[in-house]
A protein has these predicted regions:
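Metal-dependent phosphoesterases centered on the DNase I-like endonuclease/exonuclease/phosphatase
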Residues: 1-58, 108-115, 119-123, 190, ...
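Surface-exposed loop/turn segments and immediately adjacent short secondary-structure elements
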Residues: 82-86, 109-112, 119-127, 132-138, ...
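Basic, alpha-helical interaction scaffolds
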Residues: 100-141, 586-657
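Conserved pre-catalytic core of RNA-dependent polymerases
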Residues: 250, 279-490, 529, 640, ...
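Arg/Lys-enriched, amphipathic patches
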Residues: 6-20, 82-236
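Short, charged alpha-helical motifs in flexible N/C-terminal segments and linkers
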Residues: 155-252, 282-326, 331-334, 417-425, ...
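Active-site palm subdomain of RNA-directed nucleic acid polymerases
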Residues: 1-7, 378-396, 419-421, 497-530
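Short, conserved micro-motifs composed of acidic
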Residues: 41-55, 62-63, 279, 477, ...
Length: 713
């Protein structure tokens, strides 16, 4: 309620205003800007026990009337609300009724509506793309036009059928009849209807949960389904923010960072440091395009001409046209202008944050599915060239085949453990960048690509891909004005992470120059080095390295956020303590006892006790939520949920726990035991070994060993 929403707080507070405790109570409410409405005595004893507090609204004509039916008096008042507070405009959503749509009919209509292949091939890239998208949209509009309806303001109960709603109406009528008559016969009828209705609702909920969970194709979908079933999204909080407010805020946030850096001088001559070159993309066959379309996850956004799952169903009728668009784009070095638009949805970072503040939102960028299909075609060829010629940083694990956050953490952790075994202390520094993907300078990125040997239409295509991009914000049914993007790699794109990895390639040489080792995962960079415990040059070396990194960041238009950069000191032995801080400009970096690194809580003793405690808490909360709906779940559905929401957490980066004593990992084993009991709906005292055998679950210690062997293979 921090956004100025009118608020009235009233009731029997059982507080005597003439007592000292009342002063503290009034001070507390005043801190929330609540003001008390003065009245006469509200109790027959002459005290004011029934109180009214208001905020952002006025109350007049307050009247206290003794009714002689209670010790408390009746209080009436007029509540004056502002027009904005009294009337909140109804939100409207737009949907299509796709249930009645026949995909085969849509496919035939699209085939007949698209120009012939000879006519389509004569169109340039942008014209062909516009024609293709407009044809798909118009065909879908003919079958399923958009219809508007008021948005729901209450949580839905999707398992309620028309029969159950009719049954509920009869139940409520019987309840009212019994309350009115107080007749035993009416009570029996009401109780019978209540028992029958409860049983039918239980059956309907069980069937609904079972179908929803069994239809989930992967862990991510299962997690979203589980969250939506357990905690339906609440109605959006009242807010005066508009889509244009968000668009301007997101644009200015990036522009403020970019404006801090000096303007680059255009270079006329670029020297290619790579002996190999990549000047053009190879054309794709219709079979290649079909594989790209059908193998991709069917994500849909408002920019798609038709829902992606429909596009995949009718793909056979549109593949020839799509093949021309993609090959024309690759051949001409032109990225279609229609695909340069992004649709951004603001998401509140945490439910507890004030929804009236723009800085509490993060942008979620959505791109058209066909645009990402074209990006995948480029990604496959570009990444193959980079890998074959060893042009990517070997210490970059982000979005690379055979690498993950776990391999990145293993590399760093093993180095720290080996240093401790050699009686050396170590320093681990976790760098934090502000809006790193959004501030990438296109001129520097293209220069880096040239030096790697990328030229010709391939470089021209990448230049076209980066330039003239824009976005619009969708917020509560309205769309903002378009905002241009002068910097950055597209968020939510296929190529964005790869291009950012290329952009960061030269940072490694700056770090290694100071004798530091490093490892990266996308924009998360961790650098570390080991030293003798009595080395007096440690602080100077760290300061010099961070200073050069900061200079490199400035030269590459990236902002190093020193306030969020973390420093972890791992001593040579538990009894040794290093007490120092790093001063860089006006910022001071002090060592932390723990630091979160790629989702793992690391501590200065490498005991991982804090990480195990954090994992245990999150798993217990997940099990608690699963138990809430366990009566409605089958054994198979429960097992799916537990494996996706609990075991996945136990297994995340569990190779880091290899070698820890059994007492340290025991809390994780207790979680697995509890999970097995939830699957079979057994009590807490049930023997767990037979349950684990029936589930074919390895114990936690064995899972850690198995993961270690799998990664070393």
């Amino acid at each position: 309620y921090e956004d100025g929403t009118p608020l009235v707080l009233l009731g029997d507070f059982i507080i005597h205003l003439d007592k000292p405790q009342a002063a503290d109570f009034n001070t507390l409410l005043a801190s929330f800007d609540l003001k008390r409405i003065s009245t006469t005595a509200t109790h027959k004893s002459g005290n004011q026990l029934d109180l009214i507090y208001t905020r952002c609204c006025s109350v007049d004509n307050t009247l206290v009337t003794p009714l002689h039916t209670s010790d408390h008096f009746l209080i009436t008042a007029n509540l004056a609300l502002t027009p904005e507070a009294a009337h909140t405009p109804t939100r409207v959503t737009f949907r299509r009724n796709l249930r009645s749509l026949s995909p085969s009919r849509l496919s035939s209509v699209v085939s007949s509506s698209l120009p012939s292949l000879s006519q389509f091939s004569a169109l340039d890239t942008n014209s062909a793309t516009d024609t293709f998208c407009s044809t798909l949209t118009s065909c879908l509009d003919n079958f399923c036009p958009l219809s508007s309806r008021p948005a729901r303001t209450t949580p839905s109960a999707p398992w309620l059928s028309d029969v159950l709603r009719e049954h509920r109406s009869k139940l409520r009528a019987a309840e009212r009849k019994w309350h009115k008559s107080r007749n035993s016969t009416d009570l029996s009828v009401y109780q019978s209807l209540l028992s029958s209705f409860s049983a039918n609702v239980f059956t309907a909920k069980t069937s609904y949960y079972h179908d929803k969970i069994n239809n989930c194709c992967d862990a991510r979908t299962l997690f979203k389904t589980f969250s939506s079933l357990l905690n339906p999204p609440p109605p959006p909080p009242p807010s005066t923010l508009t889509a244009d407010d968000f668009a301007v805020f997101f644009t200015n946030k990036t522009r403020t960072i970019s404006d801090q850096f000096s303007t680059l001088q255009t270079e006329d001559n670029f020297t290619t440091t790579n002996a190999h070159s990549f000047s053009s993309f190879s054309p794709l066959s219709e079979t290649d395009i079909s594989k790209l379309i059908l193998s991709s996850h069917p994500t849909t956004c408002p920019l798609d001409p038709i829902p992606t799952h429909l596009l995949q169903v009718i793909s056979s009728s549109v593949i020839p046209s799509l093949t021309h668009i993609i090959n024309s784009s690759l051949h001409s070095g032109t990225f279609p202008s229609a695909f340069k638009q992004a649709r951004v949805s603001p998401l509140l970072k945490k439910p507890s944050l004030n929804p009236a503040l723009l800085e509490n939102y993060r942008p979620l960028s959505l791109l058209a599915f066909i645009a990402k299909t074209l990006e995948r075609a480029v990604f496959n060829q570009l990444s193959m060239f980079l890998v074959q010629n060893n042009l990517l940083d070997s210490n970059q694990s982000g979005f690379k085949s055979g690498h993950s956050t776990e391999t990145a953490l293993l590399s760093v952790t093993e180095a720290l453990r080996l240093a401790r075994a050699a009686s050396k202390s170590s320093v681990l520094i976790l760098l934090d960048l502000s809006a790193a993907f959004d501030t990438v300078n296109h001129q520097i990125l293209l220069s880096t690509l040239r030096k790697m040997g990328i030229s010709g239409t391939a470089l021209q295509w990448l230049n076209s891909y980066l330039s003239d991009r824009s976005f619009m914000v969708s917020w509560r049914g309205e769309v903002s004005k378009s905002q241009l993007l002068a910097t950055g790699v597209p968020q939510g794109s296929v190529l964005g992470p790869l291009l950012f990895s290329i952009y960061m390639t030269s940072l490694g040489s700056v770090i290694q120059k100071h004798g530091f080792s490093y490892h990266c995962y996308a924009d998360d960079t961790q650098l570390y080095f080991s030293f003798q415990p009595d080395d007096p040059t440690v602080v100077a070396r760290i300061s010099a390295c961070l200073s050069d990194i900061s200079s490199w960041m400035n030269d590459h238009h990236l902002q190093l956020n020193l306030t969020k950069t973390e420093l972890l000191v791992v001593p040579a032995n538990p009894s040794f303590h290093h007490n120092f801080s790093i001063q860089l400009g006006s910022s001071t970096i002090t060592p932390s006892r723990t630091a979160r690194n790629l989702g793992v809580v690391m501590d200065h003793q490498l005991s991982f006790t804090d990480h195990i405690a954090t994992t245990t808490r999150s798993c217990r909360f997940a099990l608690y939520n699963i138990r809430k709906i366990r009566p409605f779940l089958s054994e198979q559905a429960t097992q799916l949920l537990v494996q996706a929401l609990v075991l996945s957490r136990l297994d995340y980066c569990n190779a880091l726990l290899a070698g820890l004593p059994a007492c340290t990992i025991k809390p994780l084993q207790l979680i697995q035991n509890a999970a097995a009991r939830v699957v079979f709906n057994e009590p807490k005292t049930a023997h767990v070994t037979p349950l684990l055998i029936r589930l074919h679950w390895l114990p936690v210690a064995a899972r850690i060993k198995f993961k270690k062997f799998a990664l070393c293979k």
